[in-house]
Regions:
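Hydrophobic alpha-helical membrane-insertion segments
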Residues: 7-17, 88-108, 173-189
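Membrane-helix interface motif
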Residues: 18-34, 101-119, 191-200
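Short, small-residue-biased leader/transition segments that mark boundaries at the very start
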Residues: 2-6
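Membrane-interface transmembrane-helix boundary segments in multi-pass integral membrane proteins
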Residues: 82-89, 136-146, 208-226
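Membrane-interface interhelical connector segments
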Residues: 106-141
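Short, membrane-exposed interhelical loops at transmembrane-helix boundaries
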Residues: 125-130, 197-217
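Loop-centered beta-sheet repeat module
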Residues: 40-91
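Juxtamembrane interface elements at the cytosolic ends of transmembrane helices
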Residues: 18-33, 54-76, 158-159, 234-247
């Protein structure tokens, strides 16, 4: 139980971190664009951020339980099905609550013209306004984007239905769609912000002024070509070796290759 608690912490922290991004992080930049965090650790553990942490934890626990449904049998599979159904509903409820809460909270919007081809200069050159409900601006201007939060609602409900019907493959697919909807919804809400500053909004990091140098980007590109390829090959091999349900007979027959 202690190991499970420790392993759950990254999922919780991930949501807490994104919850703080949506509220703005207290930091400032000097003339060299070096950032200084001006807040406290405990200020990061605010109610909205903790709600986002619960959302992240529920979402990832649900996805893990969906995977267990496909890989296990008997009592363990039944427990995974129960966790899936509860987790999917918790994910849906916390997602809706966070959305409603966010509609009343201050968001950030760029009010000046941005030169997308200019050199990165996050410390100056833009104007940012703080407005209530600003994170819904992209959705209101492009109604088609509401498809992403709708995907969360539909995906979570269908996850429960598929799990109850013992259709584990479909349940896993709906869990994937739910996670994609949550992540894309948050990204669309913040666009083009990467990290807004709550103390100096004009120094917020945007997509166009938070980039690295051309040399670093080129180096990262070639490294990604190599190491992502290796990761994909290893992951494909791992899934091939672990294909099928795990039960006592499977473990006994493959005791040399599974460990």
């Amino acid at each position: 139980q202690r190991q499970m608690c420790i392993r759950d912490r990254p999922a919780l922290v991930f949501g807490v971190a994104f919850g703080n991004l949506l509220q703005g992080v207290p930091f400032e930049l000097n003339e060299l664009s070096q950032a200084t965090y001006t807040g406290s650790f405990f200020a990061l553990l605010n109610p909205f951020a903790l709600l986002c942490g619960v959302l992240s934890l529920a979402m990832l626990v649900t996805h893990g339980a969906n995977w267990l449904q496909m890989k296990t049998t008997a009592a363990l599979r039944d427990r995974a099905r129960a966790i899936t159904q509860i987790g999917a509903l918790v994910t849906l409820i916390t997602f809706v609550l966070a959305g409603v809460w966010l509609s009343f909270k201050d968001g950030y919007v760029v009010t000046s013209v941005i030169d997308h081809f200019a050199a990165s200069a996050p410390a100056s050159g833009k104007q940012v306004a703080v407005e209530a409900g600003a994170w819904f601006k992209n959705f209101n201007e492009n109604p088609a984007l509401w498809a992403f939060p709708a995907l969360v609602v539909v995906g979570a409900l269908l996850n429960v239905v598929a799990s109850k019907a013992n259709r584990c493959g479909f349940a896993f697919l709906f869990s994937v769609l739910t996670m994609a909807g949550v992540i894309i919804t948050a990204a669309v809400s913040m666009f083009p912000f990467v990290m807004p500053s709550s103390t100096h909004p004009e120094q917020s990091l945007l997509m166009w002024d938070a980039t690295s140098s051309q040399l670093t980007l080129n180096l990262m590109f070639y490294l990604v070509l190599v190491f992502v390829t290796i990761s994909l090959l290893y992951t494909t091999w791992s899934y091939y070796k672990m294909f099928g349900r795990l039960d006592e007979s499977f473990v006994e027959d493959n005791k040399n290759s599974l460990y």
